[in-house]
UniProtKB/Swiss-Prot annotation:
Expressed by the skin dorsal glands. The modification Glycine amide is found at residue 13. It is found in: Secreted. Disulfide bonds: none annotated. This is Peroniin-1.1a. It comes from the Eukaryota. Induces contraction of intestinal smooth muscle in isolated guinea pig ileum. GO terms for cellular component: extracellular region. The keyword Secreted applies.
Amino acid sequence: DAQEKRQPWLPFG
């Protein structure tokens, strides 16, 4: 997801 590139420190991955 694009959000992972912007905020890779979030547990979305």
